[in-house]
């Protein structure tokens, strides 16, 4: 069975607009897909001409970037990508004079965007791949709180050479990646870089020898940075801590802090941001349930490779470690260098210390005894930070400053420049 199934479904929006949702379904139990799966897409039903298309589903950005150009031959008046954080669809391509890129298709109770829209920065530079070829990179720098209105006047840099292939690079919303792919589609090929793959994936273009849809090219990477595993028993606040650490570290270090969510819960950045809005919490839980995966033999192998690749292209990697310690997890464990534990149960800590220290050889940075109370009590600072802290609730991006500071102190000691 193909790993990616596509189904066009008629849909009527809250204001009566007739559209079609192109639903992206990942058919694998673990919800993992590989670039070569783009070569075996299965269309259960295809888009109908004359009706706008909304790309909808949970998939890597390179899947969305590949699907938008594939919809063009169906003569649809516009293409949009579903943005769960707005509960709306963002127009990324249109032939309708009444619409333009960046406009929103309201799906009912859409969420207001920031009133001021800051421009995205695009920078052209060559990068080397492991096959010794130099590729043209279009780096994307997205300001915090970016508005979809940036698409209205978005153009490619004048020094971008469309007689060469283009690699899109950087952390950006799916709608921005998809729009840039469409703008650059007249190049011989367009690729989107994926940090966990340490590769770029061919998603569009006019075809070129040796570069077809779904091909992946590994780029030259640097020395491996530290990777901090964040572990502990269920219902202790592990994912809340991981997200808060990522937010705090990115604000201090910059965007080259990578979060690898090595669990099957179906939560991503989108879930955390949606759950922070009370109006989107129910929808967030629906999408989380739909994206929830099952653990398979390749699950931890996949995430182990992703952590190793991310370590070679980041300044620091955080690993939100799902489940409980078992033999299958050791491969992923050995890709990490340090660990932080958070637990609401003291009796669970010895098992986790044994797993991380004795089996993984990792260095402990901190132990947090989580509580539902608003509390911060430092128990010790050496040989690792130990504290009682809380509460840890979804939808909040704040945590005790000491927890951020200990990571910063150790990161500095490990040679990570700030």
Give residue ranges: language-model regions:
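Short beta-strand-centered segment that lines the nucleotide-binding/catalytic pocket of NTP-utilizing
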Residues: 251-270
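Long, low-complexity, Lys/Arg-enriched
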Residues: 1-52, 58, 63-163, 176-226
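Glycine-rich phosphate-binding P-loop
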Residues: 228-247
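Conserved NTP-binding/hydrolysis module of P-loop NTPases
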Residues: 271-291
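Conserved catalytic-core segment of NTP-binding enzymes
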Residues: 322-402
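Switch II (G3) loop of P-loop NTPases
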Residues: 291, 309-327
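Short hydrophobic/aromatic beta-strand immediately N-terminal to the Walker A/P-loop
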Residues: 54, 167, 228-231
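P-loop (Walker A) phosphate-binding loop of NTP-binding proteins
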Residues: 58, 171, 233
